Design a protein with these regions (language model features):
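A polyanion-binding, active-site-adjacent surface
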Residues: 2-211
Length: 211
């Protein structure tokens, strides 16, 4: 399969890269060479979704972070560790879920020796969206969970507000049940971290009750 190379001045989409009769393995291999948006130039590698191929629940975040970019795996940094802890407290087996992001490359800016996260724009989200759609189509999850505003607005509409609608069941073609909550990275930044963590666990317990 040829790689799609599109520079940052053009509207790109990963759609031509989606393999026929996709499987997670085929999708991961194809995504490794994606150049549908300029983020491939600054990201270390594509960070594709990971988890059980029979997952009832799919968690969707915004994009990989610094550690995820270096390791090539989603949710392995501080936010991922917090998610793991919350899943355990909510009674959800981490090995039985699937985690991914709406954007598969790390967008960042340099600040001294650190790489600081930058929010992807709508063009970048749109270019990468076919990968997520294909993942969900293969997995056919019972529950899809949007983690944070970027994922929620990308999948449920730009008017969606996690601050008002977190924990609500939302109709969507993505899964039998779709729900949004905060991204675990926001809990790490919160002054009342313990309170926010408990609220996050409560949201996850609602999800546990759906499966």
């Amino acid at each position: 399969m040829s790689q799609l190379t599109i520079d940052g001045d053009n509207d790109g989409t990963a759609a031509p890269l989606i393999p026929e009769r996709p499987t997670l393995k085929k999708l991961r291999e194809a995504a490794a060479g994606c150049k549908a948006c300029p983020l491939w130039q600054t990201g270390t590698q594509t960070v594709f979704g990971e988890g059980s191929a029979k997952a009832d629940v799919v968690f969707v975040g915004e994009q990989p972070g610094d550690q995820e970019d270096l390791e090539g795996r989603p949710f392995v940094g501080p936010a991922g560790k917090l998610l793991d802890q919350a899943l355990e407290e909510a009674g959800i087996d981490r090995e039985q879920v699937y985690v991914t992001n709406v954007v598969k490359h790390f967008k960042w800016k340099s600040q001294g020796k650190r790489r600081i996260h930058q929010k992807p724009n709508w063009k970048e989200i749109g270019a990468c969206r076919p990968w997520l759609d294909a993942e969900v189509a293969v997995l056919k999850p019972r529950v899809l969970v949007c983690l944070g505003a970027t994922a929620a607005q990308a999948l449920l509409g730009r008017d969606f507000r996690v601050s008002r609608q977190r924990g609500e069941l939302v109709e969507s073609p993505l899964a039998e049940k779709t729900i949004a909550t905060v991204h675990p990275s926001s809990i790490l930044r919160a002054e009342d971290r313990d309170v926010q963590f408990e609220e996050f666990v409560r949201d996850l317990r609602k999800i546990a009750a759906l499966i």
